[in-house]
Amino acid sequence: MTSTASAQQPVLRTKTPSYHAPPSTDPLSGATIHTLRCLDTPIHLGYHLIPHIAKTLLSTLPSSTYVLITDQNLEARCSVTTAFRREFEKAAVHLSSSHSWRLLTKVIPPGEASKSRDGKNAIEDWMFEHRVTRDAVVLAVGGGVIGDLVGFVAATFMRGLKFVQIPTTLLAMVDSAVGGKTAIDHPLGKNLIGSFHQPNYVFIDAAWLKTLPVREFSNGMAEVVKTAAIWDPIDFAKLESSAPAIRSAVLGPFAKDAPLDQGRTLETRTESQSLLLDVIRGSVGVKAHIVTIDEKETGLRNLVNFGHTIGHAIEAVLTPEMLHGECISIGMILEAEVARYMHGLSQVAIGRLTRCLKEYDLPVSLSDSRVTRLAKSLDVTVDRLLDIMKVDKKNSGTNKKIVLLSSIGDTVQNMASTVSDHIIRRVLSLAATVTPIHEQPNKPKVTLSTPGSKSISNRALVLAALATNTCRLRNMLHSDDTQVMMAGLHDLQAARFEFEDGGETIVVHGNAGALARPANDKQIYLQNAGTAARFMATVVSLVHNDGNQHPVVITGNKRMKERPIAALVDALRSNGTSIDYLEGHGCLPLAVKGTTHGFKGGKIQLSATISSQYVSSILLCAPYAAEQVVLELVGGQVISQLYIDMTIAMMATFGIKVERLLDPTTGRPSNTYRIPKGHYVSPDVYDIESDASSATYPLAIAAITGTECTVPNIGSASLQGDARFAKEVLEPMGCTVVQTATSTTVIGPKLGQLRQIGLVDMEPMTDAFLTASVLLAVAAHSPANGSTSNARPSTRITGIANQRVKECNRIRAMMDELAKFGVNTKEHDDGLEIFGIDYRQLHANVRVHCYDDHRVAMAFSVLASLAPGAILEEKRCVEKTWPNWWDDLERKLGIRVHGVDPECSPSLCISPSHFTKASAASTNGKPPTCLSQLTCGKALTPRKYSKHATIICIGMRASGKTFLGAIGAAALSRTFIDADVVFNEKLGAKDGLGDFVREHGWPAFRQKELEILQELIARHPSGALISLGGGVVETEACRQILAEYAQTKGPVIYIVRDTNAIVKFLATSDRPAYGEPVMDVYRRRNPWFSECSSAELVSYSEGESLAIQPCAMNVPDPSFTIQKKFGLETEVARFFKFVVGQDTNQIRDLVVDSRKGGRRTYFLSLTFPDVVPKLELIRSMESGSDALEFRADLLNPSGQPVTTPQIPPTEYVKNQLAALRHRTSLPIVFTVRTHSQGGMFPDGKQHEYFELISLALRHACEYIDLELGWDDDLLSAVVQAKGNSQIIASWHDWSGRLDWESESTAKIYEKACRFGDIAKIIGKATTMEDNYSLERFRAKVSATATKPLLAVNMGSVGQLSRIVNPVFTPITHEAMPFKAAPGQLSFRQVQTALSLIGQADARRFALFGSPIGHSLSPLLHNTGFAALGLPHQYELLESTEINDAVAAFVRSPDFGGASVTIPHKLNIIKLLDEVTDEAKTIGAVNTIIPIRDAQGVVTSLVGDNTDWIAIETLARRSLRTVHLADPNLTGLVIGAGGSARAALFALYRLGVKRILLFNRTLANAEKLAREVPPEWNVSVLTSLDEVAQLSADQSPSVVVSNIPAEGSTLDASSRGLIHLPTCMLRNPAGGVVIDMSYKPHYTSLLQLAQQVNTNHELAIGTNATKAPTRKLWAAVPGITILLEQGCHQFHRWTGREAPRAQIEAAAWDVYLQRC
């Protein structure tokens, strides 16, 4: 890169020479004009230029026709066409123009939609209609869309017309209007069709900017800041120092008596107008100069794309909600961070750029609330952005190029630089992983300067701001904390800030304590900056308030609103300052009103036991109090005295000497201070010491890795307590420490030789305890003096109690995160104890949750240098004190850092700790909307968690947490942990929890419960399912832990059970008594369970009864059925798999591009007011449906149809949903249809509507219908809270006025795609043309669609649209009480209609083989076709060989598929194009599937095998979840013939760990065992009696017989037959037996299963009059296997689930007759 740069020709970094020319007065118009040139194009800048434009064009570009094109918005606001026509007519008179001319005007629709081929054609057709000729001059009056579109029209119309740009937006003025680029959009991207066509003039009239919304002005300022950043440091300084004045030129306030054309001449132009025009002129000048040198963008011109590589990618995802300039603003910061990593761009430069962009209300991070509140923010992932960046005009092949800053006003190269993906990923990613380094032969020596001290920087800012003069602060920390402090002081008018030395020096012009309220009641937003918040609380009290003015509000982010400030508030209140808590007591936000004289002063008492910052806050402001302040510290030991001493020392430097009074009794210094009144006088220059807390991290790197590190500017003379860290912590741990007054050097011991130090008081250096903790974690050796209180080496850290109220509870954070690495800790009141381990025992691949705390992140990056695969989430939190820490860690300390995504969310807009985190640029500092805040009280909603995140179950005692949790754990193959069991094991409560409670009481129990919860979460972050005790939510600390876990780490599931059932169970329980009624306990806990959980699982009281397998009336036994299993266990497994995203039960092949065809999908709309009595009916109605629509708005507890709008009771909805869930396996579409949209839910009931939507989210519904009529913030909140649910964004128009091809419908579609995973638009047809219009709309949007579209017309005329709609067509059924919407059809009706209109061709199917005359296959498939209304036919094609008839059949155009049986299962392969891997493994094909293209033409024939699928499916359906999770699951296969290989394969795929194989001919079994893969783990038995030698629990749970029925017997004395001994079925957990023999259905094996079941029932005393709920052994006959494999064939051929009930009934009827 360096060589390339040096080889380039030097580029003069200036602007076009005309930029430097002074303005002139135009002789024609009298306006004051600045003139620039870009190539040959004059650019005129000024104010109120329409008269000037008219006179200039008539005099210099005479033409017969002037064509003015603008948009409807501008015309409506400014009457553009009228204004220009008037001035043209005036100009013609003024100029006495003799030539004939006309002015044609056209107003077009606004927005990007007009910038299309259709939009261009419309303009051109209009120009031809008006006989426009080649001498015409085209005027583009508008923003970028108008300029690009009209410019392209001018470029191509009659091969090119004269063209004038008159931009009216700031973005267009400084960007698109200059340079000659013109273009229109294509469905595949923006600006893909266009040309370079230089305008004849560009007229930049800044008066237009007053017509812009504030946001549009900011949007344009992004480009202004950008050009200054890459080219002109002087202009940049002007932009950052004069932002209020520049903004006021556009946003006001304006003088009431100002002339209407103010600014048109220099005499009337205000200072702010001149500043604005100056920065616009500067930006235009840069671009004009660059374009003049590089018109066609061969290199230099792409410098103006700074911020655009990443910014454009962000814009591609977030458009149109986020504007171009807003995305580029974020992109500039991210690209500057790339430059910092690659070329050392200073953090000062990034800080200046960040502050400057914020001054113009632009976002600077993806966590800005304007981004996070958008539904699309979930799609902003690293992979998505990198993929978009592949298509960028600056790229060279696959190499991505980014403009890299070297400093403010300069770039690394005079073109974009090549940047690798891993660097971009490193910058973009929210998390970081550190590559561990081990002992190196040549230990490196590193010298590393740390950033300026945060503590000193913040104090210096306050002191300098309150001073009477100017001070230059050097080495100040440029971070989030100091930025918000400067912003706050600026808003209070406390000081004016400037920058020198490239921003390294901050010049503070103090205002002598004369503060004022922020303009427009702006809140002072301090993020999570505790120091700034505490200092600012007293600073704002200096603002004088006569009692009539509003208070000043200081606020922060979520965590800042939890940090204590009560002691300081109490002290200020007692002194007369009025302070109100606006949210939680004792925390921000605060509304502060000073007195008439500001801060009163006098004697003040303050508790300083929590934070010394309270003391410093009052000390710093005390000189400006109305009375002399005497500050007395009360309440106990003062915390961090050294920081109080630091404040006093700094005050002395600024001219105020604080007197610490002596105790009259002892004569020793007391805790009382006298502060004289006065004004600070700043030193001319104040050098800020480097940060001692930050210095601990590089020094710790040296200590832990055995290397050497020197930190200059921190030594023994430091004011900071943390400077002691090296001598008092590292040296005793075995490091060599050399410390002078101004530097510290640490040399670490040999790797792994750190030692414990027993006891250390870190009260003087509390922030450094985190660094000490990670070092002590790998200190495996005892202290040098040999003293330790435990057998294991340990160190107890004391004096750090205040660390519990920092950015997080740091003591708990360190304990929890160290536990993940395998390090034990113990908490104490004033600190913690750490038990070290050998570094080689550290757990690998740990994900460290950083709690949005900079010190947690940096401390664990030290430990990660030895821990393989450690991932540090929220890496950006280091920006609080050391923004370039990750760069320095790699570039200076030599430890490689990579970017990774946090598991809790891949979105770059969502912090793992704060899903509602706001940035400093958010409006009034308010966080984005969250669903729970809006609609659901405090109930949480799901997230997309890691698939492996540990699940926690909570709920009332006896709700089923253990039972259901065990099922869930088995379904997910996870470890199940019962917290009650852990409690008993840890505390030896042999007689149960009741014993412990009786002995120690409930409070002691709750404390132990809290400790166990913390330990379980720390030790099992993934791969487990934990069931907690019912009372865990009684403790507030537990509730906070659970809520934080649910929001950031993993699912917390609330198990809900009917309270009456709970009471009944507890009546016989030995659990300790509550001491109060169970219902009272439930009422108290229920809200807590909701606010601590992210999902709810109903332990449905009827679930077990519903678990009985359904079957047709003529099926002899329920275990013979092919109908799908449902019930409690099935639903619990589905629920848990859905919550973690393992299997979301959603349709994966929804059609996106309707032009390409695809499988049509449908959902059945249920309209029952009570679904429970109709559950069996609903199952019979499911055939053909892909999902069920659950219409919550139509539910009614009375059981009567809903006739007027009403709100269904929430509990009723829950129970109805649970009942349906336990009776179907289909996905649920949860719908609440409002009355205006055609439903029965009252309009306007926002809270109740979203409460039901939240219910659906929490109950794991696969699809949720979300109406688009609600506010965007509400819709975004739902999308952010949807977890794994998919949103169907719906719009229903009942008026019949919806025009499918209108702009308004396009906007509805765009909005539906923005918020939904599926777009749903419903119109109403009155004519057939409405259906044709819909299909044209569908075809148009399909060209660029990324989301499936459900679009139909209601009404009988609209039925055609329902027939052809490919996605989730709502259908009804003849048995439904009424249709959910007019015109709904049944599935059969739709299929019949599709066939009639030629959209569903009739197909032919056949069975190949011999003999096949008695096969049930034709009956099976033809029954299915008829039941679903499909026009297909299945027949028999008998042959003993693969002949021409078979070949002709499979190659015929109407071939739909075929079944294959003996003798063709192998020979058929020669006719096939492909064979699946499964069929190859088994060595047989029994199914042929034709693959068709979008036109329906067969492109290939694929052979598959469904025999093994039938065996595996029926075995899995018959087994319990605990069977499938059994690590000793054993299977037995009898027979080694042709079907045995399919049976072995099926058991392997089932998850059987050991397969036993028996065959009467031993050699055949041994041969087969050798042929199959060794991972199948097949063992051959010489006799079935050998099973008796296995332990009972390792005996087979799955038995598959492949021998003829007549070949086996239960009689041990029979000769020549295989005897089936009872020992085969001795597993106490039972299982399933499958007999592949077709006849008879009641074989010896099935008889054996019946005998074992009978004996089992007798042994347990089953009441003969009561049907057992479940048999020990399920029995599956061969006929069931045949039907099951046939149903899988049916699905593969048709894409539809076979109607199993109808098929089963028909097949068994014929089968039993034949038997």
UniProtKB/Swiss-Prot annotation:
Active-site residues from the entry: 297 (proton acceptor), 312 (proton acceptor), 877 (for epsp synthase activity), 1292 (proton acceptor), 1320 (schiff-base intermediate with substrate)
Region (Shikimate kinase): 948-1165
One MF annotation (Gene Ontology) recorded for this entry: ATP binding
Tree of life domain: Eukaryota
Compositionally biased region (Polar residues): 1-17
InterPro entries: Aldolase_TIM, Aminoacid_DH-like_N_sf, DHQ_synth_AroB, DHQS/DOIS_N, DHQS_C, DHquinase_I, Enolpyruvate_Tfrase_dom, Enolpyruvate_Tfrase_sf
One GO CC term on file: cytoplasm
Gene3D superfamilies: 3.40.50.1970, Aldolase class I, Dehydroquinate synthase-like - alpha domain, Enolpyruvate transferase domain, Leucine Dehydrogenase, chain A, domain 1, NAD(P)-binding Rossmann-like Domain, P-loop containing nucleotide triphosphate hydrolases
PANTHER family given in the database record: AROM/DEHYDROQUINATE SYNTHASE, PENTAFUNCTIONAL AROM POLYPEPTIDE
Protein name as catalogued: Pentafunctional AROM polypeptide
